[in-house]
Amino acid sequence: MSRSFHTEGIILKNYRFGEIHKGVVFLSPREGLVDAVAFGAYSPKGKLRTVTDPPCMGTLYLYRDPVKGLMKITDMDCRSCFPGIRESVRKFFHASVFLETVLRTFGGEGPFVYRLLGEALSLLEAMPEEKLTELLVQFLFRYLSSAGVAPNLELCGTCGKERSDREPRYYRPGGVELYCGECSHPEDGVIPSGGVSYIQYTHTLPLVEALQVRLEETSLQSLKGYLLSCIQSLSMGSLKSLRTAEGFL
């Protein structure tokens, strides 16, 4: 295997590596999650200083150092650093949830997740803030589907009863399964029938088309709460971005 290679990537996380070096975790469609080092990136004149910050996206040029056991970033051709996301507090926190969701729970399906994350970031940068919740809902459900843990929207998770068109679904906080009214508990959260029908209809549409489908606010907020609970469960409660983003999602 060649020691030098290149791959597409989206930067998910930075951390300090020594005094002036930057640890970089990025998502590659081929390699999955990659932990690499950008040497000198924290120095004032480091050429990789800004292009290796989240959520920059582009082509990374890498070198496998078998002696040190490191992956080095030698260069990056950055296609976008998404300035529109950085300029909006709400967009920034939505992007943080997208990135940390992938960082903490990625288990495969690299090409699909890479396309989903890249498209979500591109749409997030340009879209009006009043549409952010729809994008969050669509991203989270599609991500859960790619991980193989999306809920069955048609059948009750306990009795297997098929859902009627006007029937809501219920969920246990921290769980993924959805239940019919007869199998629900008093403390369960509820997703109105319109919210369930919305996801059934839109989750197979292209993302940009799904965002054109309107949903009333109560159902939208219910879906958001449910899907965020699912992601927290999948990550075993490790998503710090959900705590820091409280009030902005």
Language-model regions, residue ranges each:
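Non-catalytic alpha-helical scaffolds and adjoining flexible linkers that form interface surfaces
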Residues: 1-22, 27-249
